[in-house]
A protein has these predicted regions:
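N-terminal signal peptide c-region/cleavage motif recognized by signal peptidases
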Residues: 4-6
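Extracellular C-terminal loop/segment signatures of secreted glycoproteins
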Residues: 67-172
Length: 303
């Protein structure tokens, strides 16, 4: 991807993208001027988004949302490369310089083919998106969280165009559509848009982890009895995977209130207590990211 993490025994709990966007103060496109380990990464702003103006050259020399889970004392490093073109989500530090959320989040690298390695859900789950689509979706997302206003008609058109198609997989002739569908579903979630259950079922039933998670998460924006019952039955179904069940639990918790929390509490002992987590390489410093088992997810809900 062009950005590596040089952290041996340092691990952290990686935040979800929604939290990162909410807490960030600036969204910019920039060029990397230099990266010196003892100083930080100097970038030149190409353009800024939203009302928070940021121009010229600035220094990134810290992290704003870093929750360490282990440390060897070796320290953390910004390993960006000179001349890279990158989108950054930034916060201002007390020293007047700037911070990204963690060493592995809050940035999206623009590749030579003008695709962006984009994060909509979590840095563990990235998508290769055309730069035009990335800017269209992220401009709307950023404006929504910072000004409560965005071009709803344009974004809904993009979302509907992609989710009305048959769910795509990882095949060579499908992967581009898969990434667009991922961006569409996740953008709808981040913008608090409601998509009917009947339109999302095909993604939940499709044999693709990412499509399942995006659609189940998006049901968090619905508030009808049919959706609540659907989620509850999905959680009870032994054939469904633990990760997806946890997402369904969180969605049902948001829309179901105390009534469904009580129902979930009654079935928690029937659910798995195995934590599957995000998977990936055990040497990845993001292994400290908390992701509960279905049983633990219910136990962690507010009563």
């Amino acid at each position: 991807m062009g950005v590596s993490i040089n952290s041996k025994a340092e691990t952290w709990n990686e935040p979800w993208q929604k939290e990162i966007i909410k807490k960030s103060e600036y969204f910019v496109l920039a060029k990397v001027i230099s990266n010196i380990d003892s100083i930080g990464t100097k970038i030149e702003i190409i353009k800024y988004f939203g009302k928070q103006k940021l121009t010229g050259e600035i220094l990134i020399n810290g992290f704003s949302q870093l929750q360490m889970t282990s440390s060897s004392g070796h320290g953390l490093h910004l390993d960006f490369e000179k001349d890279q073109i990158i989108y950054f989500l930034l916060s201002k530090r007390d020293d007047g310089n700037f911070a990204i959320p963690t060493p592995s989040s809050g940035f999206a690298v623009v590749a030579e083919d003008k695709n962006v390695y984009a994060t909509y859900r979590h840095s563990y789950h990235q998508a290769s998106i055309p730069q035009e689509i990335y800017e269209k979706t992220y401009t709307a997302i950023w404006n929504y969280y910072k000004t409560s206003s965005f071009n709803k008609e344009e974004i809904i058109g993009f979302i509907n165009e992609n989710i009305e198609k048959k769910p795509a997989g990882f095949g060579e002739d499908e992967i581009s559509l898969f990434f667009l569908q991922h961006a569409a579903l996740e953008t709808a979630y981040l913008l608090d848009l409601t998509i009917e259950l009947d339109k999302l079922k095909k993604f939940i039933d499709f044999e693709n982890f990412h499509s399942n998670v995006s659609a189940l998460q998006l049901l968090r924006n619905s508030d009808d009895k049919e959706t609540k019952e659907y989620l509850f039955n999905y959680i009870k179904n032994e054939d469904n995977e633990n990760f997806q069940k946890v997402i369904a639990i969180w969605s049902l918790d948001k829309i179901g209130g105390k009534k469904y929390r009580k129902r979930l509490s009654k079935i928690k002992d029937e659910l798995s207590d195995e934590e599957t987590g995000f998977g990936g390489n055990i040497m990845d410093p993001r292994v400290g990211t908390h992701f509960p088992s279905p049983k633990s997810a219910i136990e962690e809900l507010k009563k």
